[in-house]
């Protein structure tokens, strides 16, 4: 489990069809540890301590390669990194599992006085989980949705600090990003669907009774 608060940025130093090696400031990573890499939960398969930096290697499954942006990474690319949440630590963002729901694309970048607005397109299937002022994970970063662009995607506001300490500082129009919707939205939908099956409650019934 992760929080979407990026701890470090890493750099791709080796890439094969099913493995990736990342250079990072962390030199105490343990084999078997979970790391969020651009929002994708990977398991440390090998850890090496170099000076002044460390490296870790993770395996990339066919599912990961087909459903995330990691397949397109190249040596030299920068990455958002976060270690798994420990009990007792502060939750500064929102819960993220590291399981990507969709790959979106940067549609537009609009400069504002105090930062930038990024418009991101996504598949219509996940838009039902995205609401204004709700939480969303983009490349592993916990962000707040500014608005939903009906049928197309959503926008987020990026302050200068976030741009400086994450890969948002490198993103350009048409770049792809990993998207994870708020897991609570999916749990609520699942709960409602189960209740509908048991109770016979439908959208039409709720409209008739004034609940919607």
Per-region residue spans from a language model:
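Conserved loop->alpha-helix
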Residues: 1-212
């Amino acid at each position: 489990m992760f929080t979407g608060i990026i701890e470090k940025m890493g750099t791709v130093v080796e890439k094969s069809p099913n493995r990736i090696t990342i250079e990072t400031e962390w030199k105490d990573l343990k084999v078997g540890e979970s790391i969020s890499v651009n929002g994708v939960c990977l398991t440390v398969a090998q850890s090496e301590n170099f000076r002044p930096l460390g490296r870790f290697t993770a395996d990339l499954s066919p599912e990961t390669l087909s459903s995330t942006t990691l397949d397109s990474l190249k040596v030299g690319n920068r990455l958002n990194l976060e270690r798994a949440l420990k009990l007792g630590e502060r939750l500064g963002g929102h819960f993220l599992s590291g399981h990507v729901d969709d790959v979106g694309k940067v549609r537009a970048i609009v400069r504002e006085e105090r930062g930038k607005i990024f418009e991101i397109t996504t598949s219509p299937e996940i838009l039902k989980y995205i609401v204004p002022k709700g939480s969303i994970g983009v490349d592993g970063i916990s962000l707040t949705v500014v608005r939903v662009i009906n049928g197309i995607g959503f926008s987020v506001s990026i302050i200068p600090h976030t741009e400086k300490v994450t890969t948002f500082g490198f993103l350009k129009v048409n770049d792809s990003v990993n998207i994870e919707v708020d897991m609570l939205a999916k749990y609520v939908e699942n709960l409602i669907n189960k209740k509908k099956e048991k109770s016979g409650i439908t959208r039409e019934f709720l409209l008739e009774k004034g609940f919607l």
